[in-house]
Amino acid sequence: MNQVQAFEQSMIPETAVPKFGAGDTLKVHVKVVEGTRERIQVFEGVCIGRMNAGLRSTFTVRKISFGEGVERTFPVYSPRVDKIEVIRHGDVRRAKLYYLRGRTGKASRIKEKRDW
């Protein structure tokens, strides 16, 4: 491990990030600053992809808002991300669900993963 990797590893916070992946429905609590006030805004949707790159890890969440698709990419270890909740685990066979961008309504549903 070189010095850059060691430094990045030491900078990763000890906060517990839940295990999630593509297909999971997430609630992301984001800190939003409006003027002098700061509040928590919740963004709920399906995780369509995750990039694991140590401190620079990100994930993308997609939801349909008023008939329009909205995607947001969040850094996993950002101080702006207050909390990540996993609502349900989806059963998918792909790591990136970019094909959901062309689907709406029932066609964009994802089966729930069951642990029997």
Curated annotation (Swiss-Prot):
Keywords: Ribonucleoprotein, Ribosomal protein
Pfam short name (any one): Ribosomal_L19
Molecular-function annotations in GO: structural constituent of ribosome
Keyword S-adenosyl-L-methionine assigned: no
Assigned GO CC terms: cytosolic large ribosomal subunit
GO process annotations (BP): translation
Similarity section: Belongs to the bacterial ribosomal protein bL19 family.
Entry-linked HAMAP family: Ribosomal_bL19
Function, in words: This protein is located at the 30S-50S ribosomal subunit interface and may play a role in the structure and function of the aminoacyl-tRNA binding site.
Protein name: Large ribosomal subunit protein bL19
Origin species: Magnetococcus marinus (strain ATCC BAA-1437 / JCM 17883 / MC-1)
Gene name linked to the record: rplS
